[in-house]
């Protein structure tokens, strides 16, 4: 997977990624979503496999970014059921330490690769998606 990219050219990934911008301003655009600017952080960006996208922080503010990549039948079912949709890749959730702590736990879990680490990571992804959906639509 090639994670580095040119903002002008964008990129395609072969996995989903859930990005949390905890603080800062920036822009996002994808094949299914028009260019959108946002301020103040507290945003999830969900990237879809095989879909062109580009995003960047504002040069004036920068941003704090956390991300996790994933694939599998569970997420494919959620997308197939329209629970998650490439036309709605942004989730305005605000700033939450709990979300940041889940990303930090995912990083430690991936680095340590202890018994059951993939199941733990899958659980963390489901929790993060649950936060996105719950906070946005309640």
Q: Can you name each region flagged by the protein language model?
A:
Residues 78-138:
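Amphipathic alpha-helical segments enriched in hydrophobic/aromatic residues interleaved with Lys/Arg
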Residues 1-86:
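N-terminal regulatory/effector-sensing and dimerization cores
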């Amino acid at each position: 997977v090639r994670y580095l990219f040119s903002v002008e050219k964008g990129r395609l990934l072969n996995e989903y990624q859930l990005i949390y911008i905890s603080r800062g301003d920036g822009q996002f655009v994808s094949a299914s979503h028009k260019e959108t600017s946002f301020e103040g952080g507290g945003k999830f960006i969900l990237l879809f496999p095989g879909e062109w996208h580009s995003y960047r922080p504002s040069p004036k503010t920068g941003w704090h970014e956390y991300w996790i990549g994933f694939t599998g039948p569970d997420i494919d079912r959620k997308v197939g059921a329209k629970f998650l949709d490439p036309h709605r890749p942004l989730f305005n959730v605000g700033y939450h330490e709990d979300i940041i702590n889940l990303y930090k736990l995912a990083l430690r879990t991936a680095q340590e690769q202890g018994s059951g680490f993939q199941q733990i990571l899958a659980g963390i992804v489901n929790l993060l998606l649950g936060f996105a959906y719950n906070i946005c639509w309640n």
